[in-house]
């Protein structure tokens, strides 16, 4: 199936009433999640995973994907109007977006953020169409050694690009791999780490772990922190940027698109890094860098375009290789696996309706978001006034009901609560949960690839060095580890000398 016939079939799928509805629901929830500070797309997707069990694979993926890129749109609203980022990737939008609002230019700020997001998101969809297919053709030839090496590189990159301590992120990777080993050994059939609990024979469920780490812990953190939200009260008008605004913004939008898309493909990269790098780039090349932080529209246009382009780019390694580059894609991968579909090069051939349905839904979703965001600014502002003491307990109740409804099993509710408390403690001690989740989902594939490789080579580890792709990826992973150790040593050199 060529690209254009595939896209046409995708539009036929997405315009089916049920899929159109789930596309709309996904982007609406995503926008809502982006607008409300403190929840985020990861927590929302984790909480909504149980609702996808009764859906077809294409409907569930359309909805979850809509939540992801919808949250990138919605995050700019609170950054501009409240000076609180609704989504982590919109942090830098606060710097100039809120200043524009204070100057009476909230409308153009919101407008350019929406149009930039549309352009960046649309370009990234073209990128998925034209890159995923040839990459999948190459990946079909991958064997267990190549997949083992790629997963190693993915996990090392998630540590290397983490925002906190590299050592803490490495501990999270190891913890995720250990948790993924709970249950029945796929080769010997013996149980591991179940401690006599029959429920754990099939392993720890993805949904209670995700809901606990990203849903319950988020509720606990937000109940503890009282965010002072000074709502922008002036009337938002003139949402369409004028000609001067477009002249200033067109360059940042183009640069943000071409910067954000490849950063989204990189494991451990994504929308947050893309938005920060875009802002830094625009400030560095500006003739008047002192304007940044004082209401420069370029500081809104570039980052908002970049984070949406990165969001689209992150679908490529998941759909073409079966390797999630970040925790949100890991949750999408989990949703596919739950529906009996293994992401990767064969998925595009075996389930073309899923691949092309999602691609077409992203085109439709980006248009819906533009039409949804700008006219409903007043509604989003009213939602910002809902107190957290009302909102967060409702989210917690939703988590409890969702976890129990999976298998009508109280044990899974207990698992969710345990991981919720663990996630809260981890965040208090500045441990990132994202590397843990990536390792937890990739762990079984990583282990199977490792063991299959050794069976193929009669137990010889040299098989990983005999395959060119495996050798290159392992060499890159090794270089990243060495570089991390050197950076850590230089950073703490004085402390080592004095001790």
What name fits each language-model region?
Residues 1-60, 191-296, 381, 398-404, ...:
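Helix-loop-helix hairpins and the membrane-proximal interhelical loops
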Residues 27-41, 71-83, 158-163, 258-267, ...:
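Transmembrane alpha-helix interface/packing and boundary motifs in multi-pass membrane proteins
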Residues 33-42, 80-91, 123-127, 263-272, ...:
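Short helix-coil transition sites and intra-membrane helix breaks within transmembrane domains
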Residues 41-51, 64, 79-99, 130, ...:
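Re-entrant/interfacial helical elements at transmembrane boundaries that shape
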Residues 58-62, 99-116, 287-299, 327-330, ...:
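Membrane-interface alpha-helices at helix entry/exit sites of multi-pass transporters
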Residues 68-80, 86, 296-321, 325, ...:
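A structural-propensity feature for long, helix-poor, extended segments
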Residues 69-74, 115-127, 135, 179, ...:
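Membrane-embedded alpha-helical segments of transport systems
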Residues 111-228, 338-493:
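Membrane-embedded alpha-helical modules
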